[in-house]
C-alpha cells in the first residue's frame, strides 16, 4: 500500500481489527520510509444481483434509489442514522444471501418494508401506501390493523 504522506510503496501493518460487525477490517499501518502512521479500511467487494423490474426490464441494483425510498419514508421520524445504516446493510445482505444473479424488484420492496416495520411504524405505513398504491382510507386502515395484531 502506498503511503499517503510520501508515496513510498513499503508500509507495514501494525494492528488489524474487525469492525462493522465483522464486515470490515481496520488496519493501522506505518510507512517504512517516513514512519508516518495511517489507517485503512478493507471491505469485500460483493456484487449485488441485478433487478428485474415489474415490466420485465433488467437493471443494475441501485443502492441510492433504495436509500432514497427509505429516507423519504423516514423523513422527520426519530430514527438514528446508525439504525438506517444497519437496515440498509441488512437488506443488502439478504439480497446477496438469495444467491441469485437477478431478483425481482418486489423482493427489494418487501425487504425495505420489513426493515421499516422494525424501525418505525409510521414510516412503514408511508412506504407501504406508495409501494402498494393505496387507493382509499380503508386500505390504510387495513394495513394499520395488521400492524396492531
From Swiss-Prot:
Which residue spans match zinc fingers labelled unnamed? 3-34
Keywords assigned by UniProt, alphabetized: ATP-binding, DNA-binding, Metal-binding, Nucleotide-binding, Repressor, Transcription, Transcription regulation, Zinc, Zinc-finger
Member of which family?
A: Belongs to the NrdR family.
User: Which positions carry the signal peptide feature in this UniProt record?
Assistant: none
Tell me a Gene Ontology molecular-function term this record carries.
Answer: zinc ion binding
Query: Start and end of every ATP-cone domain?
Result: 49-139
Query: Source taxonomy lineage?
Result: Bacteria, Pseudomonadati, Pseudomonadota, Gammaproteobacteria, Vibrionales
Which purpose does this protein serve, as stated in its record? Negatively regulates transcription of bacterial ribonucleotide reductase nrd genes and operons by binding to NrdR-boxes.
GO annotation, biological process: negative regulation of DNA-templated transcription
Q: Carries keyword DNA-binding?
A: yes
Q: What is its cofactor?
A: Zn(2+)
Protein name in the entry: Transcriptional repressor NrdR
Give the source species: Vibrio cholerae serotype O1 (strain ATCC 39315 / El Tor Inaba N16961)
Cite the cofactor comment: Binds 1 zinc ion.
Q: Does the keyword Transcription apply?
A: yes
Amino acid at each position: 500500500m502506498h503511503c499517503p504522506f510520501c508515496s513510498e510503496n513499503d508500509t507495514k501493518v501494525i494492528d488489524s481489527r474487525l469492525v462493522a460487525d465483522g464486515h470490515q477490517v481496520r488496519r493501522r499501518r506505518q510507512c517504512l520510509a517516513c514512519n508516518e502512521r495511517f489507517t485503512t479500511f478493507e471491505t469485500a467487494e460483493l456484487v449485488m444481483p441485478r433487478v428485474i423490474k415489474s415490466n420485465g426490464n433488467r437493471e443494475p441494483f441501485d443502492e441510492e434509489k433504495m436509500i432514497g425510498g427509505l429516507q423519504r419514508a423516514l423523513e422527520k421520524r426519530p430514527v438514528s442514522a446508525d439504525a438506517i445504516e444497519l437496515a440498509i446493510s441488512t437488506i443488502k445482505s439478504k439480497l446477496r444471501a438469495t444467491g441469485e444473479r437477478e431478483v425481482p424488484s418486489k423482493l427489494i420492496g418487501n425487504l425495505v418494508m420489513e426493515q421499516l416495520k422494525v424501525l418505525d411504524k409510521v414510516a412503514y405505513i408511508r412506504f407501504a401506501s406508495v409501494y402498494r398504491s393505496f387507493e382509499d382510507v380503508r386500505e390504510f386502515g387495513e394495513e394499520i390493523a395488521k400492524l396492531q395484531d
